Amino acid sequence: WGMHYVALNAPGIMPGNPMGYQWFDLYLNGVYISDVGPKEFEIVRSLINENVKKISNSISLISNDLNIEMSDCFVMGFSQGGIMAFELGQSLNKKLAGIAIISSRIISKEYVPNNSFLETPIFISHGAKDNVLPISNFDQSVEILKHHNYKFESHLLQNDEHTMSQETITLFQNFIKKNI
């Protein structure tokens, strides 16, 4: 394909999982992020925004070194990385080649879509047997994408848990081929 791949790790180690990384703490004051109040959500939002800037700077540096445009970049994120991928796309004033949200969700239910991002193709997938993020997160994310008229394809994978299966990889590869 003549492609370059770069994988960024989140800066924090997941509590209870020394092999896992996190962009932000899932539990603020002992409350899971889906259940936090507005004050705690603002803390999560500021952490997301801070890390989105770091990701954006990293991608800019790498794309400049490789002499490629942002419109030639696909950004994929798994779990919290999917949240970050969507938020990155939303924060840029540029169209990307594509965004992938895998076993993840769109964290904000209310926002004003960025017109450049509305033109970016989005791949979203989730495992029906995911025991980390409920399917309701996938359903809500798909509804947000539909409501704002994003260009997207969605895949609910019946045999998948909270993982990147071979089926997910194949579907994402096909998404890339369609959008390069």
Model-derived features: where do they sit?
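Serine-hydrolase catalytic machinery in alpha/beta-hydrolase-like enzymes
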Residues: W1-I68
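Short, proline-enriched alpha-helix->beta-strand connector loops that line the catalytic pocket
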Residues: M70, F117-I122, H148-K151
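Gly/Ala-rich beta-loop-alpha elbow adjacent to hydrolase catalytic centers
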Residues: M76-G81, A85
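Active-site signature of alpha/beta-hydrolase-fold catalytic machinery across serine-
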Residues: E87-S91
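A conserved short beta-strand
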Residues: K94-I106
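Short beta-strand/loop motif that positions the catalytic acidic residue
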Residues: F123-H126, D130
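C-terminal catalytic histidine-bearing segment of alpha/beta-hydrolase fold enzymes
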Residues: S136-I180
